[in-house]
Amino acid sequence: MQEMSSIPNVIFILCDIANKIELLNSTFDKKKFDVVLSDMAPKACGNKQVDHANIINLCEMSLEIAVKFIKPNGIFITKILQGEYEKEFYQSVKYHFNSVKYFKPKASRKDSSEMYLVSLGFKENLEYI
């Protein structure tokens, strides 16, 4: 895990998210946010299929958090790797948001499968799937 410089009006949480979802629930309770941004990435093992499955797992956890804590019409951004489970995850995000688009930063290597899903217009009152 890497530290990050503070940003005004931003709540930055550095933790192993797999073990902290209940902590987030108790910390933020009924608080809602305009944006949920996940730049999480697992430690790469070098096997593209395993690395992809691991990041999709993190993406699913970040989506679960977004669905719980985001305001209506809110924004969700998450890092993703292209691969076998990408389309299924995309469909899950699309269920909860009006617009979902891929974004590849200019700083990202051209041969990298890393990109971001930028999701706008959170649809309130849908159950997490």
Swiss-Prot record:
It comes from Ehrlichia ruminantium (strain Welgevonden). Its EC number is 2.1.1.166. The active site is at residue 79. Gene3D superfamilies: Vaccinia Virus protein VP39 (3.40.50.150). GO terms for cellular component: cytoplasm. It catalyses: uridine(2552) in 23S rRNA + S-adenosyl-L-methionine = 2'-O-methyluridine(2552) in 23S rRNA + S-adenosyl-L-homocysteine + H(+). The lineage of its organism: Bacteria, Pseudomonadati, Pseudomonadota, Alphaproteobacteria, Rickettsiales. Pfam families: FtsJ (PF01728). Keywords: Cytoplasm, Methyltransferase, rRNA processing, S-adenosyl-L-methionine, Transferase. The keyword Membrane does not apply. Its main location: cytoplasm. This is Ribosomal RNA large subunit methyltransferase E. Specifically methylates the uridine in position 2552 of 23S rRNA at the 2'-O position of the ribose in the fully assembled 50S ribosomal subunit. It is found in: Cytoplasm. Belongs to the class I-like SAM-binding methyltransferase superfamily. RNA methyltransferase RlmE family. One of its GO terms (molecular function) is rRNA (uridine-2'-O-)-methyltransferase activity.
